[in-house]
């Protein structure tokens, strides 16, 4: 997945689900 736990719970400014890279 590109979001959630693998992304460290990161989210984009658009309130979208982002990857661990921040996009």
Swiss-Prot record:
Regulation: induction: By infection with the fungal pathogen Ascochyta pisi.
EC number from the UniProt entry: 3.2.1.14
Biological process terms in GO annotation: chitin catabolic process; defense response; polysaccharide catabolic process
Superkingdom of origin organism: Eukaryota
GO terms, molecular function: chitin binding; endochitinase activity
Record-linked SUPFAM superfamilies: Plant lectins/antimicrobial peptides
Keywords from the UniProt entry: Carbohydrate metabolism, Chitin degradation, Chitin-binding, Glycosidase, Hydrolase, Plant defense, Polysaccharide degradation
Ion transport found in the keyword field: no
Enzyme superclass (EC): hydrolase
Catalytic activity: Random endo-hydrolysis of N-acetyl-beta-D-glucosaminide (1->4)-beta-linkages in chitin and chitodextrins
Role of this protein: Defense against chitin-containing fungal pathogens.
Similarity annotation: Belongs to the glycosyl hydrolase 19 family. Chitinase class I subfamily.
The protein's name: Endochitinase B
Species in which this protein is naturally found: Pisum sativum (Garden pea)
């Amino acid at each position: 997945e590109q979001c959630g736990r693998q992304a460290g719970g990161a989210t984009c400014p658009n309130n979208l689900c982002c990857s661990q890279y921040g996009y």
